[in-house]
């Protein structure tokens, strides 16, 4: 896969440098190890030869017929040569010379091969006598060192060098839950599984989630945007997902900034909001649109009001429509749908005494285009009440017949 190629290209220079160091170190150790093996085998043979010589000398002194020590020494020398050849063959088989630099794939493949046991090779070293002497050497505490080119030792050294010097971890941490391949390097642990960073993605949009916050739902991983779009409540104002604080009213959810007046789109202040037909309004717009209007000023009524003449009034607006005097709980008079005080009511109807300017509530005298209380309709000269209904008018003033005749009848025209 592309990700595997990128990883191989990234670690290739580090592996090349490390393998070069390993090649040099291995060759030096191999030569030292072979030399040590030969010296140990020679010492073992000399001990065995000395033992045989002593036995031969003892047998001759006892008068026994034995093989000549010169012949035995010659045969032992031949056995020694054969033993050395076997040792060298085994050493060559265990420690082959490094003719070329091993590849990364060959080193990693050796991890799966079982390590070669040193005991199996030691059993094939020469005759029984030499094998026995070699075992004796081991029992004396001189055990040979482990083969430096042993596969598990070499791979372990390589892993340690890569981890300490280059920060590259070559030990698989587990299998990726997405692709099923081993994970070497960075790993994402989520939903109880392990993933390659590039394989742990949103199940909706496919975006990588290794370095981003994510949400889990029914065992599936979602990026923040897709999770909120699918499962978060929606704002009734903008119809987008709500991811933070919200306002819940009338079984609806709103962003705080979207919870505004349906008329002026301004946020609600300390006065709160009012609801009408599923819409929210600020106090000013709600009363302006839906509150009853005062018949006096045509403004919305928001508090106390007076109902009169089939309509509503602010208490301050329910006054005489001519003089503006408040009725103060007293009676009022209506004329053409307007509340009036008594005086202006009678003025509007023409029922004001022309003499006293008082209201005429009962009988009245209509004369000269005016109205009078009966007791106020008098002669302008003698001030007698004109009760008979006959009078004389001079300059819009009433006179009785007597005063008229005395004053105006004798006056020449």
UniProtKB/Swiss-Prot annotation:
GO terms for molecular function: metal ion binding; vinculin binding. Residues 33-157 are annotated as: Disordered. It holds the Pfam family LIM. Isoform a: Expressed in all 95 body wall muscle cells as well as in the pharyngeal muscle cells (at protein level). Isoform c: Expressed in the body wall muscle cells and in the pharyngeal muscle cells. Residues 49-69, 118-143 have a biased composition (Polar residues). Coiled coil: none annotated. Belongs to the paxillin family. Required for myofilament organization of the pharyngeal sarcomeres and for pharyngeal muscle contractions and hence for pharyngeal pumping. Together with lin-8, might be required for myofilament organization in the body wall muscles. This is Paxillin homolog 1.
